[in-house]
Swiss-Prot record:
It comes from Rickettsia felis (strain ATCC VR-1525 / URRWXCal2). ATP binds at residues 16, 202-206, 277-279. Homodimer. Pathway: Metabolic intermediate biosynthesis; acetyl-CoA biosynthesis; acetyl-CoA from acetate: step 1/2. Signal peptide: none annotated. Mg(2+). Can also accept Mn(2+). Belongs to the acetokinase family. The gene is ackA. One of its GO terms (molecular function) is magnesium ion binding. Substrate binds at residue 87. The active site is at 144 (proton donor/acceptor). The lineage of its organism: Bacteria, Pseudomonadati, Pseudomonadota, Alphaproteobacteria, Rickettsiales. It is found in: Cytoplasm. This is Acetate kinase.
Amino acid sequence: MKDVILIANAGSSSLKISIFEIQNKKVKDKIYNIFLEKNVNKILFHINKKQESATDIKDDAIEMMIDLFEDWWKKQENLNLIATGHRIVHGGKNFNKPVIVYEKVSKDLTVLIPLSPLHQPYNLQVLDLFLQKYKEISHIACFDTSFHFTNPPITKAFGLPKKYYDKGIIRYGFHGLSYKYVSSHFKEMTKEDLPTKTIIAHLGSGSSLCAIKNGLSLTSSMGFSVLDGVMMGTRTGNLDPGVVLYLIDHEKMTTKEVTELLYKKSGLLGMSGESSDMRTLLASNSPDAKFAIDLFVYRIVLEIGKLTAALEGVDCLIFTAGVGQNSAVIRKMITEKLLWLGIKIDDTKNQKNEHLISTSDSKVKVFAVPTNEELIIAEEVMKFL
């Protein structure tokens, strides 16, 4: 029988479950990649990218996903579940590292739902369901915000009265699990030490950038929420707060409508009027699609400039996540606007998606590497066993 740990990443309409084999107290291989998604009135169940079933939705979708998983799990007689790990988007001001979850911790995390209303409820719903169904094992919560606890106070503050800072209205930063994976596995992937002043660009459906100094997060593009920073697939990125006030006061939009607009109808999708998928936009002949891509690139270039200033220089730029690792076109568009940093890209290496894509005489080393949030959670879980 194989000992395994389960890693869960829940969204509003989907649940990703990765199952890793454990040998000699170390994470060995991912043996199952399970994806459940809500599709119109059915829940689709995929195992290792193959659809296994389509079930009519008759109840709460997330609860049904867990039940479908459990039905499948009961048939896996050769697997022994020893722990679960859960991606939790927001850890607030108190959770600066992964924790074993018990009743009080679960209540403390529930209090943070207003800080991440579109992610935290589903993260916690799945966590609580696993707590109920598998009481005899440990359940570990890993936070996207924890990596940024090393940010100095000056980088966290808004220009609001201090009482709001004290209440936790600060810049938290997100995608921390991705940044932790890339920074901690960098030498393993590239055979090089992580340079002192590094900027990591996590570019996917959600995008952010992080300035890392001596291996620690200094500041990042996302702030109080995952809306901040660069433009994303469906999110606005950095937005003048006056726009929100205008939408409410003059466009007569409700806060719910504004939330829907900022999180789900903006970004690449809103600007192009076509898609949030970069591959679709790159293949499009639409002027609006081209403008959306140009704006995406422009905002990223500005953010790299800002983070370079925060670091007082930059030694290394790392692209990661779906777009960052895989789109040679987007990397080229970004780096062509960074010639002032002395960046030079080897077009052949870039087209091949090699890890090191800069030339030997580039003043800043540029890399394109994968991220693996599930694996970094699995490694964190093992520290508790």
